[in-house]
């Protein structure tokens, strides 16, 4: 371990020694090797990060919107210049295929930052006349210091999705990356500093355990929490934020999304969409369409088409250019996914392909799970009810449109949904009845910077991306002006 780099915290534009005396390791899930050791933040370090953020935010908010925009655009340029380097690090840390991280993760994160850099100058209030001698106007002001808590599946993309609107609106952000995949968030902090962001405007405090998240959610200075993660943790974060200082929250939580294949769907297109909706990023996407509803009349042909495509998935070393399916992000998560697969078998679902761990050759060293497709599924099975967050597709048959809509909505989640059909009227009719915040027709998975994303029900609160998200990072001040005499009743 002598050649393993030790990473400090990133506070006030530089790396600083953590005061906890504790460390944790980042593990390469492709082979189980330690790739980095990270110092863990203490409560004292959180206080230092908050004070730093307060100082930096005052400087940042005092800049013109155009100045802030230019700095954020410089960060975009640096991200794109360093795309391949960052993608390699993301692949080492997450296990995601380099063919994916190099074309999606940094690229889409930079797109979101560029989008909000352009919107920084568009934040404005309004002026409304009340009568000849009086009017009021509004100002949209930054919240101040906000915190982001990231998930492990899209580390740098999530850090950018959270920081971009926050910084564009004039806030400072303290970001806690997942302890499983913390490395690229630290690189992002370096890039922000290089681009000219004032010290303290983006601080990174990493650590294992729940204490850091709790210190952030309960801190009286922090005005907002943006969290991405599981439902149960999200509920605790939200309760803690409300119980401390009534903080604003954005919650991007779990999903168990339905993909409805209609009777008139092009079978090849439907199978392509289903495979992408389940096995992209090794199945570790919160919006995955893991409940695939297929008409009974087309079930056999659809299952055959899906299996043919799954056989073409290239599992292997995530750094290899031809690999498009890497390991899961951690060994504990692999065990969780495998337990769900065993549950599916025990509850009577039929394995069409996959169904276990990948152990061929070098794959045995990593957290690899075979792309798995279950048929003969019922709505009551655990693999259909619960979020697995892995490469597990459940195929369910249906007979009528009314039936499939009811079953698709029969879940506590409401993150995403999709419909595949050649009848555009049917597509809209179904989608308008589905209880989900992100919906796709004849496609799946794209989340452009301009599109607000977020869930219904227990899948989340608030939105990320799009114009509406800027409102989550500002507050409105109303000012009335009287030009005439003031008449008192006393």
Swiss-Prot record:
Site (Seems to be a necessary countercharge to the potassium cations): 248
UniProt KW keywords: Metal-binding, NAD, NADP, Oxidation, Oxidoreductase, Potassium
SUPFAM superfamilies listed in its UniProt record: ALDH-like (SSF53720)
Pfam families in UniProt: Aldedh
Residues binding K(+) 1, per UniProt: 26-27, 93
Enzyme class per UniProt: oxidoreductase
Record: active site: 162, 252, 286, 464
Transmembrane segments: none
Function summary: Involved in the biosynthesis of the osmoprotectant glycine betaine. Catalyzes the irreversible oxidation of betaine aldehyde to the corresponding acid.
Quaternary structure and interacting proteins, as annotated: Dimer of dimers.
Record family assignment: Belongs to the aldehyde dehydrogenase family.
Protein name: Betaine aldehyde dehydrogenase
Native source species: Acinetobacter baumannii (strain ACICU)
